[in-house]
Amino acid sequence: MSSAAASATAGSVTGKTPRILACVLCQHRKIKCDRSFPCANCQRANVQCTPSTPAPARKRRRPNQDLQERLARCEELLKEYAPDGKPDIARLTTKRSSLSQSPPKGEEPLPEWNRHGKLIHEDGSVRFVDSYMLSTIYDELRAMRDIIDHDESTPEDESSDYMTPDTNADLLFGGDTPQPAGNSMELQPSPGHIFRLWQVFLDRVNPLIKLVHVPSLQPYFVEATAGAPLPKNIEALLFSIYTLAAVSLSDAECTSILGYGREAALHRFSSGVRASLIRIGFLKTHDLTTLQALVHYLISLQGRYNRHAAWVLNGVVIRIAQKMGIHRDGTMLGLPPFETEMRRRLWFQILSMEFKTALMSGLGHSLLPRVWDTQEPKNVNDADLHPSATEPVKDREGPTEMIFVLITNKVARFIVESPGIEPIFLYHDEKVKKIPGAPSEEKIKEFRGLIDGLSKSLLELTDKYCDPAAGPLHQYTIEFQDIIMQRIRESLEPGDATIETHIDHMFKMAVESFESTVVSYRNSCKVAYLWFLRLQFHNDLFTFLAGQLSQRPSGPLVDRAWETVENILPYHPELLKVNASKENLLLASLLVKGWNMREEYCSTQMGITLNTPPYIEHLRSVVPQDYVKSENSSPSALSRIPKANRMVTREAASDQLSVSGPMDPTFDEFIGNYLDGADWDVFSRINLENPAFPGVPATGITPQVNATASDILPSTRIDHTDPNQTSHQFAMYGIDPQSAWQ
């Protein structure tokens, strides 16, 4: 083909003189073409020379009218809110005054059209906004982003922001957290251990918190054992479950199952949780699974973390939940029934954690949003919930695996909605009602009415949904409810004549509480929920008890207190580790100081020589003497002792001052501070071997995927160190992990 012919051909296509291009072969070989056809290169190669044709001209993009209209609408909204940079006070005042329904007392006014708020989905995350203006702007911005993304030839990588490490997380997790880029597979348990930890969680932890949907989550454990890559939020959730399972195990059990101790397991799995959450960027990437993992993690920190820091961390959880709209019921937001129910479970667990951590931190006010309407979870088994369900979830008649959570939710809601009720537990006696600031008779009567209402609602719940024959969880729940109401009512009863001050009353309550704790420990040593009982231990109240003993040398109540201290310490040997914390050092010094004063008082005033308990001998050897210098032996100190604590005969003293043997070395370290809002030890009198339920084994319920009322029956206790027993329990889930353990 000649050059002229090529030019003519090109000209007929474009309609104007085109730029002469290199031939196809020269372009392909990336060599210089002389742009004559045939070119010299093609002639030498003896091949056909084909001229290139220019690419079709790109159509000129017209201005996007829709985009411009949306921008103009955003500008109008902003001008309406703040023209010339100043808000239109008159217009805002008019809008507020036009609201037909006034909000409840103490709540901020919300526009009628924005009563329920709105969820904003963006970049794989969800945020809640209750501002009409902002929700409208977010809608417009999202629509504009969709337009721009649709026009772009290269779509943006949606996962890039999701995988960006969250640098702010160091504010919560410290500098020892593994780097986000690290391989979390190194922290994963082995395939066989994964199934064992999952079963421990189902048996011991899940019945008490009910945050996850077992049938939906279980396939991920199968994938984890196969080494398949998991979504980052699922990975974080699994690590949080491993952590809670390790918390529920004793050191001996952990060593038998995993091959390493409990503390090593907690450090390993906690590091996995933190690394996964940081890799997700949990402070800016919000989804239900990530929040479940974070809540599980905070539960595992109870007792292992400073109580004030725990309250601060729980504030982060509340803000994330609020940003996701968890505080608004899913029915108001148009969410599917399954998601609505799971959000309810999560919110009430957060609510329980908030009031407990607030009270443990010494705060009476809550960080909860002033406007929340999330309904309480329904009485349904996990098998009754289906992710694809379209009908609203309804309560199931009869016993289910939710019974314990339903009771704790009622109690938590009562405490949160009854601020100011705590003082009446201390200011009920006739002698102290005149103290400035004491509640009036009318206020006490009002609170007693509220407590009667709580008692009635709890009784209705247990009568309707609780059946002792349905297993130990239901027995546990019945006694839990009875203990709460009994302790509250006892606190409201008039005190005896020996109670002189509210401090005396607190001392009496502390002694009775820890006496009940000892009984519950002794009767529940082989129960799957014993770990949970131990986590109820109130360190601060125990230190208060020791402080009172350092000022009260003798008396019937003092004798009971010393006996209780000696019975408590075998279950909490971590308290004897003086170098572990300043709190432990303070406790040890108070105990040594109190025993020294008691010895001297009984020797000089009563002629009795006491046998020194082994724990006192140990503490004397490790506590610096500067911490135990005391003036309690002086007459002025003894004169300050309440009369009730000095009135004791030689015979009574010799009977009451007996010392038991050495501490039982079989108990491992379980740390306190978990659940204790309305009462210092709400589980303190639970006896799961109560003769009211003869023949019922003391064990936890293993949740079943297809559980019915008849399925939730007592079975033999699971020994999690025995693979055969654990393998049998997996039959109900359709899994045979035996081969994975070999």
From Swiss-Prot:
GO annotation, biological process: DNA-templated transcription
UniProt-listed Gene3D superfamilies: Zn(2)-C6 fungal-type DNA-binding domain
Source superkingdom: Eukaryota
Residues within the DNA-binding region(s): 23-49
Keyword DNA-binding assigned: yes
UniProt xrefs under InterPro entries: Sec_Metabolite_Reg (IPR050613), Transcription_factor_dom_fun (IPR007219), Zn2-C6_fun-type_DNA-bd_sf (IPR036864), Zn2Cys6_DnaBD (IPR001138)
Effect of inactivating the gene: Leads to increased expression of the pyriculol/pyriculariol biosynthesis cluster highly reducing polyketide synthase PKS19.
Biased composition (Basic and acidic residues): 105-116
Example GO molecular function: DNA binding
GO cellular component, one term: nucleus
Swiss-Prot/TrEMBL keywords: DNA-binding, Metal-binding, Nucleus, Zinc
Keyword Endoplasmic reticulum: no
CDD domains: fungal_TF_MHR, GAL4
Region (Disordered): 85-116
Compartments, as annotated in UniProt: Nucleus
Function: Transcriptional regulator; part of the gene cluster that mediates the biosynthesis of pyriculol and pyriculariol, two heptaketides that induce lesion formation upon application on rice leaves but are dispensable for pathogenicity. With TRF2, negatively regulates the expression of the gene cluster and the subsequent pyriculol and pyriculariol production.
Protein known as: Pyriculol/pyriculariol biosynthesis cluster transcription factor 1
Species per Swiss-Prot/TrEMBL record: Pyricularia oryzae (strain 70-15 / ATCC MYA-4617 / FGSC 8958) (Rice blast fungus)
Gene: TRF1
